[in-house]
Amino acid sequence: MKASDILNTYNNAHGGDILDFSANVNPNGTPQSVKDTIIGSLDNIAAYPQIYCDRLRHSIADYYNAYIGDGINLTDNNIICGNGAADLIYRYALAIKPSKAVLVSPCFCEYEEALQCCGCNNIIHYMLDTQDFVIKKDICSLLDCDVDIIFLCNPNNPTGINIPPDIICGILTECEKNNINVFIDECFLDFLNDDKERTCIKEINRYNNMFILRAFTKIYAMAGIRLGYGITSDYGLINKMYKSGAPWNVSTIAQAAGIAALNEKDYIDSTRLLINKEKQYIYNEFDRLKIKYWKGSADYIFFKSKNNLKEDLIKMGILIRDCSNYYNLTDGYYRIAVKKHDDNERLINALKYIFNIYLGNGV
């Protein structure tokens, strides 16, 4: 059962009082300016939205040209907007129609599901617990001329681990040599203090075979709006992606909300401060509880603990993400969102209670 189904079931039975740590969106909530813009845009919903999101694409290009600099010179033509990141993942797969893809595991399940729509054969490169789930150089040995696409997620979901810059560089070089498309999901990179240095957007003019996925969903807490975007220098790919789905896929409200969100610099800064502070609090408490965890870079924490921990926490009104359905992961792997302190404290207290009662740790 999906986390959303469990949440709905529990809310119906218990009056909606469950604390959801399974969805890793910004704990600060949607910016007020975005909410105000949504309300203000209601007068425009009688008309069709801009079919290619012209104003939004222009705003995204301006944002990164100012933020990253380094002469990247993004234009509207480098950008495609979609009905959330998932919409663009499917459009990308349908536009390319690959025969063989390389996936890194564990990873976001939508990549594989989109590729299944194309009848694509997948090669799985497993990241190992014993190697801290870090991609190693040997992945390049899979990138031969028979491969059409590789999907990367930086930082990874669910582990939160960054791909080392030298590994990304090696992958891009090998893929360019063998004419392989590179899909890089950077939807959680906005939570990093050094995102400007880590993003591959600055390499957009160097690698024509690269497509970078971003979204407003997580960083701006806009999951219900459904708004994502992709950046590439392959204009032909963008045209194919437009033809791989329905037109008018981004609503007037979503386009207006995205433009407003891009002006929220202080909001991003305060979010990063909050996430870093609260992650350290959780790390410290996990150390006391002797819970194994991985220090990732995103707004969530990946950890390993007792089997059935999810069920134990649901009984206490807390929902976490069970990661046992990912390739290469078994029972006992979990992911939690980093939330505000009171919520994080409630989770820690629940864990202390569980380990006292069930494990007798005496914590």
Residue ranges and their predicted role:
Residues 166, 315-316, 325-363:
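PLP-dependent enzyme catalytic core of the Aspartate aminotransferase-like
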Residues 1-47, 59:
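N-terminal "arm"/small-domain region of PLP-dependent enzymes with the aminotransferase-like
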Residues 118, 177-178, 207, 289:
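Helix C-cap/helix->beta junction micro-motif
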Residues 94-152:
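PLP-dependent aminotransferase-like
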Residues 130-192:
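Active-site phosphate-binding strand-loop segment of PLP-dependent enzymes
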Residues 49, 62-91:
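Short loop-beta-helix segment that forms the pyridoxal 5′-phosphate
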Residues 30-33, 52, 209-286, 291-294:
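PLP-dependent aminotransferase class I/II
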Residues 129, 276, 286-317:
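Conserved PLP-binding catalytic core of the aspartate aminotransferase-like
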